[in-house]
Curated annotation (Swiss-Prot):
Pathway: Amine and polyamine biosynthesis; agmatine biosynthesis; agmatine from L-arginine: step 1/1. It comes from Marinobacter nauticus (strain ATCC 700491 / DSM 11845 / VT8). It catalyses: L-arginine + H(+) = agmatine + CO2. Catalyzes the biosynthesis of agmatine from arginine. This is Biosynthetic arginine decarboxylase. One of its GO terms (molecular function) is arginine decarboxylase activity. InterPro entries: Ala_racemase/Decarboxylase_C, Arg_decarb_HB, Arg_decarbox_C, Arg_decrbxlase, De-COase2_N, De-COase2_pyr-phos_BS, Orn/DAP/Arg_de-COase, PLP-binding_barrel.
Length: 637
C-alpha cells in the first residue's frame, strides 16, 4: 500500500517493512488500518474507531481484531502455493492447516475457515494438539473432506474422537508422535470398522535457529527417530495395514528467520519421503509443519524476530525441493500441508490503550557548586561549562566519558558518607543537563557518536506508564524477549523528537518493554511526538494475533481486556461486531477461589463493627460492590 508522504512516521517506526501493507499514517498523524489490500481505499481510522468504541461503552484497553486481515493472510499463503505449483508443474495439492493453539478464539478460527476463495477450494484445514482442541475442531470444520491433523500426545479417547471425525466425513490424519500410540490407533480403528489415516512425525536433524529452535531437530519433544520410523513401517506391514500410512510430518521449528534453514530441512524431509515410498508406504501427503516466519521488526534479516524471505519464496522452496527429489526418484508428487499459524494470525489484531502518566528526567536549572564542594561536583560543573563554550578544545566523547566518571565518584562518595543528599541531588541535576546538551550536539551520521547517542537516549528517556499488563497482553515480551511493533496511533504529525520506555501498570519491575522497532533497527527507547495535553496519546501494540491471547496470565489479577471484531462491508465501511467484555474484578477473583458474595459479606461484617453511620456504611458498601463488577484495568486517566 502506498505511503502517505505527509507523515515522517512511516520511516521513524519502519512501518512499511513490518506492517505488510496493513498500516499507514494519514496527513493528520493518525494510524489507519487497511484490512483488505485488494481495496486500498477502504481504510479504518484507528483513533476514530477507538473513540467510537469508548462512546459505545467499550473503554480502553481494548483488543481490536480485523477479520479481513485474517482472510487476506489465508489467501496470500494459498495463492503463493497455487502460483508456484502451477508455474512449476507440481502435481500435488496445497492445504493451509491452521493449528488452533496459536489463537483458539472461536471467531478467529471461523474467520480463517471462511476466507474466500481458499475456503470454497477446500484449501483450509485445522490442526489440534489436545482433546479439547480436537473437540472444538470437529465442531468448526465445515466441509466434508476438510483436512484435520491430530498432533500431540494421544490416549485412547483422543484417538477415538479423531476416528469419529473421520466417520463424519473429514480427512483426519492421526500423526504418530510416540510409538505407543500406533497399537491404540489400530485397535480403535478396528472397533469402529474404519481404515485410519495414519501419519508419522519424523524427527529431523535440521533445526531452524531462533527462540523456538528446540521445537524442531533432534532435541524436539515430539517425533520419531529414523529407526523408530522403520519400526512403525514394520508394525504396519505385519498388521497388513501399511496402506493406512498416508502422511509424513516434520517440524523445523517456529518463526524460522533464515530461508537456508528451511531449505536444508526440506531436503532432509524429501529424503524421508522418497525412502518410505520405496519401502511401499503409500504416503500421499507431506505436512511440512510450522516455521514460516513473520517480520515483527521489519529488518528483513536473520534476527529471531524477523525473516529474510517472502511468503512466495517460502512456497517456491517447499515445492522446488520436494518436486526435484520426487522427479529424480520417479515417484508421485505428494499433496502439501503447512501449519503456518503465526503467519496467518499475527497481523490481524492490535491492542489499543491510553497513557496514564509520564515521568521525565530531572530538568531543573543547575546551580554552580560552592567553592568547597566535593571534587566530582566541580568536575561536572566544568564539563557543563565546556559544553556551553563553542571554542572548547574538548571532544564531545571526552566530555561524555568524564561525566560518567564523575557520577560514579558521586555515587561512591555518597555511599561512604562523603557527600550529603543535597550535594548528590545537585550532581544529578548537573549530570542530566550535561546529557541533554551532549545529545543535542551529537550527530548520528558520525559513526563514533552512535553508541553514545543510544546510551543518552536511554538515560534521557521518559517513562511512559501505559494502561495494560505486559504479562496478560504481551507475555512473549517478558518470557522470550519477543519484539512487537509499538507506536502511538495519534499525534504523529508532531515532531518525533522525544524518547520513552514503556512501563505497564503491574507491580512488577519486569513489566516494561526494553526493545522497540524504529527506522534504525531495534532500539532501547521508543520515539514519541511532542506532548500535547489537549491531545493525549493512544498507544498501539501491533501484530499481537499469534499466541499472546492464550498465553497471557493474570499477574496482579489483571484479566482479559475487552475485545471487538471489525470487518469491512461491501461499501468499504467498517462494521463492529458484538464486543466481548473483558474480565471484571469479580471474575478474576473467582479464578483464585475468592467468591465475591463471601467478600461482600466480609465487608458487611467489618462495617457493622466500624462505628460508622448506617448511611455511610451503605454508601461505602455500595462502592465496594460496584468495584467488584468493575474492569480490572484503570478506568480513568
Amino acid at each position: 500500500m502506498a505511503e502517505t508522504a505527509a507523515s515522517p512516521a512511516h520511516k521513524v517506526y519502519n512501518i512499511a517493512h513490518w506492517s505488510d501493507g496493513y498500516i499507514s499514517v494519514n496527513g493528520q498523524g493518525e494510524v489507519e488500518i487497511c484490512p483488505d489490500r485488494g481495496r486500498s481505499d477502504a481504510r479504518i481510522n484507528l483513533p476514530a474507531l477507538t473513540r467510537s468504541l469508548a462512546e459505545a461503552g467499550v473503554p480502553l484497553p481494548v483488543l481490536i481484531r480485523f477479520t479481513d486481515i485474517l482472510h487476506d493472510r489465508v489467501n496470500k499463503l494459498c495463492n503463493a502455493f497455487n502460483k508456484v505449483t502451477q508455474e512449476q508443474g507440481y502435481r500435488g495439492r496445497y492445504t493451509a492447516v491452521y493449528p488452533i493453539k496459536v489463537n483458539q478464539q472461536r471467531r478467529v478460527v471461523e474467520e480463517l475457515l471462511s476466507a474466500e476463495p481458499a475456503a470454497s477450494a477446500n484449501q483450509v484445514g485445522l490442526e489440534a494438539g489436545s482433546k479439547p482442541e480436537l473437540m472444538a475442531v470437529l465442531a468448526l470444520a465445515k466441509q466434508a473432506g476438510s483436512v484435520i491433523v491430530c498432533n500431540g500426545y494421544k490416549d485412547r479417547e483422543y484417538i477415538r474422537l479423531a476416528l469419529i471425525g473421520q466417520k463424519l466425513g473429514h480427512r483426519v490424519f492421526i500423526v504418530v508422535e510416540k510409538q505407543s500410540e500406533l497399537p491404540l490407533i489400530l485397535e480403535e480403528a478396528k472397533k469402529l470398522g474404519i481404515s485410519p489415516l495414519i501419519g508419522v512425525r519424523a524427527r529431523l536433524a535440521t533445526i531452524g535457529k531462533g527462540n523456538w529452535q528446540n521445537t524442531g531437530g533432534e532435541k524436539s519433544k515430539f517425533g520419531l527417530s529414523a529407526s523408530q520410523v522403520l519400526d512403525v513401517v514394520d508394525t504396519l506391514k505385519q498388521a497388513g495395514a501399511l496402506g493406512t500410512l498416508q502422511l509424513l510430518h516434520f517440524h523445523l521449528g517456529s518463526q524460522i528467520a533464515n530461508i537456508r534453514d528451511i531449505q536444508t530441512g526440506l531436503r532432509e524431509c524429501a529424503r524421508f519421503y522418497t525412502e518410505l515410498h520405496a519401502m511401499g508406504a503409500p504416503i500421499g501427503t507431506v505436512d511440512i509443519g510450522g516455521g514460516l516466519g513473520v517480520d515483527y521488526e521489519g529488518t528483513r534479516s536473520r534476527s529471531s524476530c524477523s525473516m529474510n524471505y517472502s511468503v512466495f519464496e517460502y512456497a517456491y522452496n517447499v515445492v522446488h525441493v520436494l518436486q526435484s527429489e520426487c522427479d529424480r526418484q520417479g515417484i508421485p508428487h505428494p499433496d502439501l500441508i503447512s501449519e503456518s499459524g503465526r503467519a496467518l494470525t499475527a497481523h490481524h489484531s492490535v491492542l489499543v490503550t491510553n497513557v496514564i502518566d509520564r515521568e521525565y528526567p530531572d530538568n531543573r536549572e543547575p546551580t554552580e557548586p560552592a567553592a568547597e564542594a566535593p571534587a566530582p561536583l566541580q568536575d561536572l560543573w566544568r564539563d557543563l561549562e565546556s559544553l556551553q563554550d563553542e571554542d572548547s578544545p574538548r571532544s564531545l566523547a571526552e566530555i561524555y566519558h568524564d561525566i560518567l566518571h564523575a557520577m560514579a565518584d558521586v555515587h561512591a562518595q555518597f555511599a561512604h558518607g562523603l557527600l550529603s543528599l543535597q550535594e548528590r541531588a545537585q550532581a544529578e541535576t548537573l549530570y542530566v543537563r550535561c546529557c541533554r546538551m551532549l545529545r543535542a550536539e551529537l550527530d548520528s551520521a558520525n559513526r563514533a557518536h552512535r553508541e553514545i547517542i543510544d546510551e543518552l537516549n536511554e538515560k534521557l528517556a521518559e517513562k511512559l506508564f501505559v494502561n495494560f499488563s505486559l504479562f496478560q497482553s504481551l507475555p512473549d515480551v517478558w518470557g522470550i524477549d519477543q519484539i512487537f511493533p509499538v507506536m502511538p496511533i495519534n499525534g504523529l504529525n508532531r515532531s518525533l523528537n522525544r524518547r520513552a520506555v514503556i512501563q505497564d501498570i503491574t507491580c512488577d519491575s519486569d513489566g516494561r518493554i526494553d526493545q522497540y522497532v524504529d527506522g534504525q533497527g531495534i532500539e532501547t527507547t521508543l520515539p514519541l511526538p511532542e506532548h500535547d495535553p489537549e491531545s493525549p496519546l493512544l498507544m498501539g501494540f501491533f501484530m499481537t494475533g499469534a499466541y499472546q491471547e492464550i498465553l497471557g496470565d493474570m499477574h496482579n489479577l489483571f484479566g482479559d481486556t475487552h475485545s471487538v471484531d471489525v470487518k469491512l462491508d461491501q461499501q468499504g465501511q467498517y462494521q463492529v461486531g458484538e464486543p466481548i467484555t473483558g474480565d471484571t474484578v469479580a471474575k478474576v477473583l473467582r479464578y483464585v477461589n475468592f467468591e465475591p458474595a463471601n467478600l461482600l459479606e466480609a465487608y458487611r461484617q467489618k462495617f457493622r463493627h466500624s462505628g460508622l453511620s448506617e448511611e455511610l456504611q451503605q454508601t461505602l458498601l455500595a462502592e465496594l460492590s460496584s468495584g467488584l463488577e468493575g474492569y480490572t484495568y484503570l478506568e480513568e486517566g
